[in-house]
Regions:
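Short, well-ordered alpha-helical microsegments
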Residues: 133-134
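Non-catalytic substrate-recognition and accessory regions of acyl/acetyltransferase enzymes
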Residues: 1-96, 115-125, 129, 138-163
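Conserved acetyl-CoA-binding loop-helix of GNAT-fold acetyltransferases
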Residues: 94-114
Length: 163
């Protein structure tokens, strides 16, 4: 089994992630950085056509949620858009966690491409909103070596395609 698995949340697993992340971040930082996103996730536990879903990037080794992922599939099911990846506050120290963050994003891309439930979707895109995100996307692009897939930039989008 892979270290990471992209799985649906249920109320229990989302509540557990919320409790653990709040303990790591502290109450004030959690309220500022994550509270609104967890409230959104509670309303997006099931996949509805044309709407986004909250998914759990579950660390199977440590038995924890390392990131919350927002994905939406196009109405035709040909492409998924990776809208957000919210890493756990345990990765806030970007200077010491950069390799871990690149691994998180790589695992998210791989899992979205190969996970059942996204119809015939075989293309995933992520937008580099700022210079830091573009730097992470460039790192992922340079390290990408998963067979039968292709990673390429389309402007500020990093696009992954399963052949």
């Amino acid at each position: 089994m892979s270290k990471y698995e992209l799985i649906p949340f249920d109320q229990t697993s989302l509540h557990d992630a919320r409790s653990k992340w709040e303990a790591i971040a502290g109450e004030d930082a959690f309220d500022l950085e994550f509270s609104g996103f967890f409230e959104w996730a509670e309303k997006h536990l099931a996949q509805v056509e044309g709407d986004s879903i909250a998914l759990n990037l579950h660390n199977n080794d440590a038995l924890r949620t390392d990131a919350i992922v927002e994905v939406v599939s196009s109405r035709k099911g040909q492409m998924s858009k990776l809208l957000k990846v919210i890493p756990s506050p345990m990765f806030w120290d970007v200077n010491n966690s950069r390799a871990d963050i690149v691994t998180l994003y790589t695992e998210v891309f791989f899992n979205v491409l190969t996970r059942q439930g996204f119809g015939s979707s075989r293309t995933v895109k992520l937008y580099g909103r700022d210079d830091e995100m573009m730097s992470i996307l460039r790192s992922i692009h340079s390290l990408w070596s998963i067979p039968n897939t292709k990673a390429e930039f389309e402007g500020r989008f990093l696009t992954f395609t399963l052949n």
